From Swiss-Prot:
Database matches in CDD domains: FH_FOXD4-like
Annotated Acidic residues bias: 20-34
Record-given protein name: Forkhead box protein D5-C
Polar residues composition-biased segments: 59-70
Gene3D superfamilies: Winged helix-like DNA-binding domain superfamily/Winged helix DNA-binding domain
Gene that this polypeptide is encoded by: foxd5-c
Expression sites by tissue: At the onset of gastrulation, expressed in the superficial layer of cells in the dorsal blastopore lip (Spemann organizer). In the open neural plate, expressed in a row of cells destined to become the floor plate of the neural tube. After neural tube closure, only detected in the tailtip and a small area located at the midbrain/hindbrain boundary.
Length: 342
């Protein structure tokens, strides 16, 4: 009998130790639950519960086993819940927007391509494969990629070759934009890249400030020169104001006589105007109007030249000899030569 009491006391001490260790893991059950741990821990087992060898009956043992089984399920459920939370946390961290601008993303895609050029669809495929954030939000950001390609000078459009089938043009980087990012880091950009010279012709010629034509690949910067008279070469023939211009003959058919008459501008200017001579309406004036066309026709009998017309305009347009000499001397002293230009 004493042996049975010692064994019961030993089991009771083990139960107290188990409660202290797993007190946080076990849920509190109701008082009427037959498998409640309180009914076995805080109550003294009776003789009816004990067997012949001083152990608990199978019914109580099954209760303890079920309690331990339920606690194991709760532990597995707790660990599973924590795993789900960790998994969800990883998914949320993967969907964070990358710290790169659209220009940086396009630059990365083009630089990692084999031929250093990609189409719009190729750029979008690269971004979607490398960044899951943009993969889930495609194609909402495709228009942003298209706008950045067309509005930034650092990207150059390359037409597709005739023998290369496909849709869309290629895009590549401007060779002068290699230093666009600070120390090669795509997180920071120094400033917006702008082309230094504007392309004016399709054949690749660029017009610079002093009206020189050079290829766009040559990095030449035109120097600013003051607005002065240009130097006139020595072999350049400048017409003098004393040299008469060649006569220009114009033949006009005459409907009255059927012959060609040669008109002269001097006779037109020398012809007196009689518009204000007679203002009264008389028979003589009316009869005299029929004779005026003959006078006009007879006055165009000489050669028509431009000497008198260009005499005044030539003096205004062309500088005098002294001005040309001074301009030529000052231009020879201040000639500026630009390398690489004709």
């Amino acid at each position: 009998m004493n042996l049975s009491q010692d064994s019961s006391a030993h089991h009771q001490s083990q139960d107290y130790a188990g409660v202290s260790d797993d007190e946080d893991e076990i849920d509190i059950l109701g008082e009427d639950d037959p498998c409640s741990p309180r009914s076995h821990i805080y109550q003294q087992p009776t003789d009816s519960d004990m067997g012949d060898r001083g152990v608990l009956s199978p019914s109580k043992l099954s209760c303890n086993e079920s309690a331990s089984h339920s606690s194991g399920e709760r532990e597995r459920g707790t660990s599973k819940h924590s795993l789900d939370t960790t998994t969800n946390g990883k998914v949320k961290r993967a969907l964070v927007k990358p710290p790169y601008s659209y220009i940086a993303l396009i630059t990365i895609a083009i630089m990692q391509s084999p031929h250093k050029k990609l189409t719009l669809s190729g750029i979008c495929d690269f971004i979607s494969s490398k960044f899951p954030y943009y993969k889930d939000k495609f194609p909402a950001w495709q228009n942003s990629i298209r706008h950045n390609l067309s509005l930034n000078d650092c990207f150059i459009k390359i037409p597709r070759e005739p023998g290369n089938p496909g849709k869309g043009n290629y895009w590549t980087l401007d060779p002068a934009s290699k230093d666009m990012f600070d120390n090669g880091s795509f997180l920071r950009r120094r400033k917006r890249f702008k082309r230094q010279h504007q392309e004016l012709f399709k054949d690749g010629l660029v017009m610079y400030n002093p009206l020189h034509y050079c290829t766009p690949n040559s990095a030449l910067q035109a120097q600013q020169i003051p607005m002065t008279c240009l130097a006139i070469p020595e072999n350049f023939a400048m017409p003098n104001h004393l040299v008469p211009y060649p006569d220009i003959n114009i033949t006009v058919p005459c409907p009255d006589q059927g012959v060609h008459r040669v008109l002269t501008a001097q006779d037109v200017d020398n012809h007196p105007s009689n518009s204000h001579s007679k203002c009264s309406f008389s028979i003589e004036n009316i009869m005299g109007e029929t004779k005026e066309p003959e006078k006009h026709l007879t006055s165009f009998n000489q050669n028509w030249n431009y000497n008198h017309l260009l005499q005044s305009s030539r003096l205004c347009l062309l500088p005098s000899g002294s001005h040309l000499a001074n301009a030529h001397h000052s231009a020879q002293c201040n000639l500026i030569k630009f390398p690489g230009c004709y």
